[in-house]
A protein has these predicted regions:
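ATP-binding N-terminal substructure of ATP-dependent carboxylate-amine bond-forming enzymes
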Residues: 1-96, 128
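Active-site nucleotide/adenylate-binding loops and adjacent lid/helix of ATP-dependent enzymes
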Residues: 4-5, 101-142
Length: 142
């Protein structure tokens, strides 16, 4: 089976190293990959991890049997959703679930709504509003 791993960081390299141990795996493609990953997978540096259309086209044209999407940006952009829609089984959260990592405001609002302990926070649209808030903050701002 041919696999696709989207990304080019250390996390993706570790995933590729473990996937290589499976005797069912024939070829692993890394989009875009990196110099270190090139020893363990076929890197495709001309396709960005955020070019969802190109990733899906590549996966379909190379008959990829399974994909792994790890970086935050492609997850937030819906890479898993698009691969699933194209019939490619995929490991990684869909865009809706990825919001908890890709949007700090969403994550903080979710924690507040469900009473999950988290540091105090406020959200601002302007730097002036943020500076005004800091003058009255009752906690040590970091």
């Amino acid at each position: 089976m041919d696999l696709l791993v989207v990304g080019g960081g250390g996390r993706e390299h570790a995933i590729i190293k473990k996937l290589k141990e499976n005797p069912v795996v024939e070829t692993i493609y890394a989009l875009p990959g990196n110099g270190g990953i090139a020893a363990d997978a076929v890197c495709v540096p001309q396709i960005s991890a955020t070019d969802i259309g190109a990733i899906v086209d590549f996966a379909v044209s190379h008959a990829v049997g399974f994909a792994v999407v790890a970086p935050d940006d492609p997850l937030a952009l819906g890479c898993v959703d698009a691969l699933h829609a194209a019939g490619i089984p995929c490991f990684g959260p869909d865009a809706r679930a990825a919001r908890i990592e890709s949007s700090k405001v969403f994550a903080k609002d979710l924690m507040k709504k469900y009473h999950i302990p988290t540091a105090q926070y406020e959200v601002f649209d302007t730097s002036a509003a943020a500076l005004a808030y800091l003058k009255t903050a009752s906690f040590p701002p970091i």
